[in-house]
């Protein structure tokens, strides 16, 4: 898995607070247990005018022409509240989002996002409001995220964010739980070699 060190991308300004996981990916799409294929159902109830997903809602921000190809989601507080479905970050990642910026995230959603190699950035409500205003005023322009420096650069302004160092290390190095285990492969093999044959 590739590491996430710096990222430059378009921002979708989702001007809503308390966006729950059912809005992100409704329950009727949760049958699959693989991580791919959910992006087309992302924000289903808001994004489409029909259940068959053939009529995009022209009033929903994800369908606006200037935000096509966006990889950064900007939202208000408590993003990802509701049920703990891991399909929510799967859908966001499958759509193409790599970074999310909000004043706060639901705890389980926050951890699930990190586990799925997406970067959830917490900034103050005032900072998030400033970014909303900039994005609305500058359609089509990208912002820059630097995980090594823990900064978000929006126009001429630089915002600083915090992230647990262990989580930061995993994102920088592209490590999931399996990758973390493999970092200790030699130590595991050495330990296993000491186990009596009849216990192996």
Curated annotation (Swiss-Prot):
Gene Ontology cellular component annotations, sorted alphabetically: 3-isopropylmalate dehydratase complex
Pathway it works in: Amino-acid biosynthesis; L-leucine biosynthesis; L-leucine from 3-methyl-2-oxobutanoate: step 2/4
GO molecular function terms attached to this record: 3-isopropylmalate dehydratase activity
Alphabetical UniProt keywords: Amino-acid biosynthesis, Branched-chain amino acid biosynthesis, Leucine biosynthesis, Lyase
EC number: 4.2.1.33
Source taxon at top rank: Bacteria
GO-annotated biological processes: L-leucine biosynthetic process
Reaction catalyzed: (2R,3S)-3-isopropylmalate = (2S)-2-isopropylmalate
SUPFAM superfamilies, alphabetized: LeuD/IlvD-like
TM stretches of this protein: none
Top EC class of this enzyme: lyase
Role according to the record: Catalyzes the isomerization between 2-isopropylmalate and 3-isopropylmalate, via the formation of 2-isopropylmaleate.
Protein family (similarity comment): Belongs to the LeuD family. LeuD type 1 subfamily.
Subunit structure: Heterodimer of LeuC and LeuD.
Descriptive protein name: 3-isopropylmalate dehydratase small subunit 2
Organism expressing this protein natively: Mannheimia succiniciproducens (strain KCTC 0769BP / MBEL55E)
Gene (UniProt): leuD2
């Amino acid at each position: 898995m590739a590491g996430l060190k710096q990222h430059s991308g378009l921002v979708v300004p989702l001007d809503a607070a308390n966006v729950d996981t059912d809005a992100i990916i409704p329950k009727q799409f949760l049958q699959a247990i693989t991580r791919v294929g959910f992006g087309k159902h992302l924000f289903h109830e808001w994004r489409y005018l029909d259940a068959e997903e053939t009529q995009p809602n022209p009033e929903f921000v994800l369908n606006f022409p200037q935000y096509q190809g966006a990889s950064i989601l900007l939202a208000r507080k408590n993003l990802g509240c509701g049920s703990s479905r891991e399909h929510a970050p799967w859908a966001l990642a499958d759509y193409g989002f790599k970074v999310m910026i909000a004043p706060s995230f639901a705890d389980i959603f926050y951890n699930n996002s990190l586990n799925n190699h997406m970067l959830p950035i917490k900034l103050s409500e005032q900072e998030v409001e400033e970014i909303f205003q900039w994005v609305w005023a500058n359609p089509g322009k990208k912002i820059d995220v630097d995980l090594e420096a823990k900064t978000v650069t929006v126009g001429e302004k630089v915002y600083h964010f915090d992230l647990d160092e262990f989580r930061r290390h995993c994102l920088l190095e592209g490590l999931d739980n399996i990758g973390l285990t493999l970092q200790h492969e030699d130590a595991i093999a050495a330990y296993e070699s000491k186990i009596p044959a009849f216990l192996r």
